[in-house]
């Protein structure tokens, strides 16, 4: 009989074998066996940087160009996936948590300079990593579900960058790790349920923005073909790149926005 062990279902239909093979350089943690182009973790980080930049250009400079926001949806599922991989591979979870906390605090003044409210994405990742630590130690699926739901609701009310959705993505990648078909199904279900929920909220509040952005979030599914190509390897060790790039690119875009606003006045 299968059982829940905090990281997923193990047993007859579980992923115990895959988890034991998931060292860097071993079989890919998500994608099925494929030939052709494969992508390491460094390559995925570069895609995140590009998608995030496009997304923020759309948010700040060309808000009417919704296709820019759609391209930007690639970023969060890849970041959530890499966080889960980092959690399973790190030898120093405390250092990982501390690094996220430090950069979350350092990036927040820049984030609030650019955006009027909310918390930056490093807080999403910090909360997600803490959640992984907690659920790994819970043996009850019901307590796990209650904890994940509570953290997601809290993320919505404290206005994490991705509200509840980023935390839920982290959990999805965690419990389906090593089983790509389940990853596709679970992520699709999450995003469709989220879009449906906010369609109802939008209808009841008369605010179309809720429905629009959460239908755009379905574009997160575009990240799945890229994750299917993940080869399980770290690639170049440039872990500081994303941490530094995030606040720097926001500052540069903010400066560009001010220049454009000044030129148009």
Residue ranges of predicted features:
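Alpha-helical transmembrane segments and their immediate juxtamembrane cytosolic regions
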Residues: 2-265
